[in-house]
Amino acid sequence: MYVVTPLLLRGLTGSARRLPVPRAQVHSMPPEQKLGVLELAIGFTSCMVTFLLPAGWIMSHLESYKKRG
């Protein structure tokens, strides 16, 4: 069984190595206008709230989660 497994895996990965990998052609231009302080503050605040609010909720209720489990 163990002798056959590497041969099977080598057979599966051998055909995958020959497949062409598509490459993305992404071209961008510089922004037309710079972002202001208010726009940066709103974007930064929304990102921080999105990531930190759920983590804070979980951390503040960790003891109740431990008691339930």
From Swiss-Prot:
Mitochondrial matrix side: 26-36
Positions of disulphide bridges: none
Matching InterPro entries: Cyt_c_oxidase_su8, Cyt_c_oxidase_su8_sf
Protein's pathway: Energy metabolism; oxidative phosphorylation
Record bears the keyword Transmembrane: yes
Chain ranges for the short sequence motif SIFI-degron as given in the UniProt record: 2-19
Transit peptide feature, positions: 1-25
Record's subcellular location: Mitochondrion inner membrane
Membrane topology recorded in Swiss-Prot or TrEMBL: Single-pass membrane protein
Keyword annotations of the record: Membrane, Mitochondrion, Mitochondrion inner membrane, Transit peptide, Transmembrane, Transmembrane helix, Ubl conjugation
Transmembrane segments: 37-60
A Pfam match: COX8
Residue spans, topological domain Mitochondrial intermembrane: 61-69
Example of a GO cellular component annotation carried by this entry: respiratory chain complex IV
Family: Belongs to the cytochrome c oxidase VIII family.
Role this protein plays: Component of the cytochrome c oxidase, the last enzyme in the mitochondrial electron transport chain which drives oxidative phosphorylation. The respiratory chain contains 3 multisubunit complexes succinate dehydrogenase (complex II, CII), ubiquinol-cytochrome c oxidoreductase (cytochrome b-c1 complex, complex III, CIII) and cytochrome c oxidase (complex IV, CIV), that cooperate to transfer electrons derived from NADH and succinate to molecular oxygen, creating an electrochemical gradient over the inner membrane that drives transmembrane transport and the ATP synthase.
PANTHER family: CYTOCHROME C OXIDASE POLYPEPTIDE VIII, CYTOCHROME C OXIDASE SUBUNIT 8A, MITOCHONDRIAL
Name this protein carries in UniProt: Cytochrome c oxidase subunit 8A, mitochondrial
